[in-house]
Amino acid sequence: LDTDSTRITSSFNYFPDSELQNLIRQVNQTRAYYKKQGFDEVYLSIIPNKTSIVAPKMGRYNHLVERVQQNSMLKTPFIDSWTPFVQHSQEVYSLSDTHWNCKGQAMWLEAVNHYLSEPKFSILNHSEQNL
């Protein structure tokens, strides 16, 4: 399904800039909504499908993940799984299907933990802000 360009989930499905802008607006609106509901922050983490990492040259690749993450309209902080997945492309997905394997899951979790362990997320800083 990742390679069938007629399906919206395909890495080769045409995704025009107008749809990209709409998608980013919706992501930003979702973040604003949940922040208004009391969440400290909302993050975006796009898990790239196997074809976009392992075989992007099988067709006319739409670069959707990169286009979202690099778009200046995106106000929602994102946790980048694209970069480490590309660097370890043959190691992060199951051989027999399109799902990520334990290494892929661990790499994503490591990226999340690294992002959340930055100084702005420390308990001390959070406590001081609430005084």
Language-model regions, residue ranges each:
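Extracellular glycan-modifying ectodomains
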Residues: 1-131
